[in-house]
């Protein structure tokens, strides 16, 4: 048995309607002054209201930072840090997609530790400590609630990462109620994104690839593959929404410990230069990268093919990997995901 180290978020709660019980679930952890991090769109939709009401009823003071932008720039992180300090926050609660969670993770760290962003870019450079942190995803895709990674846009288009176990939150809450209103297009792109995380984690050439990550990746693919169509075409189905959230989380745990590869390497510059959402950037290049990798990775893709498409279990091993790649491309088209950069302007 190979040796490995595995790190993840220590407390995970899957509860439909859980946000309305946030004071009971995480009130003691967050303390008496909480900053909620989100974007203006989610605030306008009222998705924060259950959390605000629950916290205030528990005599916990709430301040809201709703200026998070897509592909968050450094200024976003610094503005949140200043907001946290101005309100003397005892805890940070992020409710949103990957951008909100990434911003919250870094700001909760530097607001407490006094480090600057330039101090902590890179791998395992941050010293900490950080404020108590709870993350609540509103999309099933990024897995940021269980990853020690935040990606920040520097300058016009360059992206830099902060990678540190200090970015793992104290708790992640998966609440399907928060995802039932997601448009089909967002559900599809973020769902494919989660699949990318699982596929790349399973196939990773990293020395950190390990049996636990591979097991999580396969479980993620089974959940995502069997629920993504329902989540896209019947968005009010809470069972499918919860399954997608869990699949995304498992994929996040997998790639947090067994790093992603070429799909993400190509997706980041697409997002940085053309402002294409990260999940969609991954979806655009997925099939192309898998086809390129087939000569060296066909045995790996054959192992996971039936996790997503059970009918491929009856296909010969020699043909299964190629069929897997083509069926992924077909699934992406079926879900309405754009296939070319031209389609996303």
Predicted segment positions?
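N-terminal amphipathic/basic leader segments beginning at the initiator methionine
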Residues: 1-29
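N-terminal small/polar loop signature for handling phosphorylated ligands or for N-terminal nucleophile
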Residues: 43-115, 125, 229-241
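Short, acidic/small-residue loops that bind anionic groups at enzyme active sites
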Residues: 113-138, 166
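Gly/Pro-rich interdomain helix-loop hinge
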Residues: 273-345
């Amino acid at each position: 048995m190979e040796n490995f180290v595995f790190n993840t978020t220590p407390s995970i709660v899957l509860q439909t309607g859980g946000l309305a019980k946030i004071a009971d679930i995480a009130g003691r952890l967050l303390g008496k002054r909480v900053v909620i991090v989100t974007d203006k769109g989610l605030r306008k939709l009222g998705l924060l209201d259950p959390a605000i009401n629950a916290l205030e009823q528990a005599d916990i003071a709430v301040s809201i930072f709703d200026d998070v932008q897509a592909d968050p720039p450094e200024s976003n992180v610094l503005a949140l840090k200043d907001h946290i300090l101005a309100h003397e926050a005892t805890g940070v609660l992020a409710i949103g997609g990957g951008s909100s969670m990434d911003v919250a993770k870094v700001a909760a760290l530097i607001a407490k530790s006094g480090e600057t962003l330039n101090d902590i870019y890179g791998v395992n450079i941050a010293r900490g400590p950080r404020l108590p942190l709870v993350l609540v995803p509103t999309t099933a895709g990024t897995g940021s609630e269980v990853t020690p990674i935040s990606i920040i846009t520097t300058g016009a288009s360059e992206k830099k990462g902060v990678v540190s176990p200090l970015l793992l939150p104290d708790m992640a809450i998966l609440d399907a109620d928060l995802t039932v209103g997601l448009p089909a297009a967002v559900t599809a792109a973020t769902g494919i994104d989660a699949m990318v995380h699982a596929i790349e984690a399973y196939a990773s050439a990293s020395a950190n690839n390990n049996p636990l990550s591979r097991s999580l990746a396969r479980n993620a693919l089974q959940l995502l593959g069997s629920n993504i169509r329902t989540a896209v075409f019947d968005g009010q189905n809470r069972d499918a929404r919860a399954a997608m959230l869990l699949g995304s989380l498992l994929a996040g745990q997998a790639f947090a410990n067994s790093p992603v590869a070429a799909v993400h390497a190509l997706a980041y510059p697409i997002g940085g230069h053309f402002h294409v959402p990260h999940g969609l950037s991954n979806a655009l290049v997925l099939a192309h990268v898998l086809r390129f990798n087939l000569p060296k990775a066909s045995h790996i893709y054959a192992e996971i093919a039936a996790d997503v498409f059970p009918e491929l279990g009856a296909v010969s091993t020699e043909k299964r990997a190629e069929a897997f790649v083509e069926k992924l491309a077909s699934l992406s088209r079926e879900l309405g995901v754009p296939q070319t950069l031209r389609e996303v302007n």
